[in-house]
Amino acid sequence: MRKLPRQARHRVLEITLDMSSTMHAIARECFPNAEQVIDRFHVQKLACDALQELRIEHRWEAINEETNEMENARLEGRKYRARKFRNGETRKEILFRSRLLLFKDPAAWNVKQRKRASVLFELYPDIQKAFALVQRLRRIYSSCKSVAGARLKLALWYNQVNEAGFHSFNSVAASVFAHWNRILNFSTTGVPTLPPSLLTPSSRP
């Protein structure tokens, strides 16, 4: 950064970065006149990761439950058959195959994903609630055009996260609180929203 002329660095008025304290310090030192904007990708990814963590917790519960049922069936000398729900999948399969649909906007779901999501949300209302929180955050980024409007909606979202009481969302709420002003700066910039597909990791349980 210091290889850039000092005068040129001082002309930079805006810089987009992640939530790293190191990057914050570097940006402040190298671009003292630039307004810092937290890249919305990092905020949205925190929320998506928290949602997936909740799904994974339930998946392990389903795996353990199925393992116990299989063992009981073996001890009783009967054949084990896992219950299949109306979309033709077992509880464990639903939780495993729901990974990608939870990264998407519901409008982008195909028929099979819509059926799977319907069953998933009936079985796990907490996943449905967490999914709604992620979607609300995306709408804040896509709809707010002023700091005042963004502040109001983000504050409401922050309160909803706290009221939901999801352990996996604690780090999301803490990060939003810690970087509040720099997150709100997104509403004064023209940086485009990254599509949900870019939030999908290449591999995840």
Give a label for each model feature.
Residues 36-40, 58-61, 69:
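Short, surface-exposed linear patches
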Residues 48-59:
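Short, surface-exposed amphipathic charged segments that create phosphate/polyanion-binding patches used
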Residues 2-32, 45, 64-205:
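Acidic/histidine-rich catalytic cores and adjacent linkers
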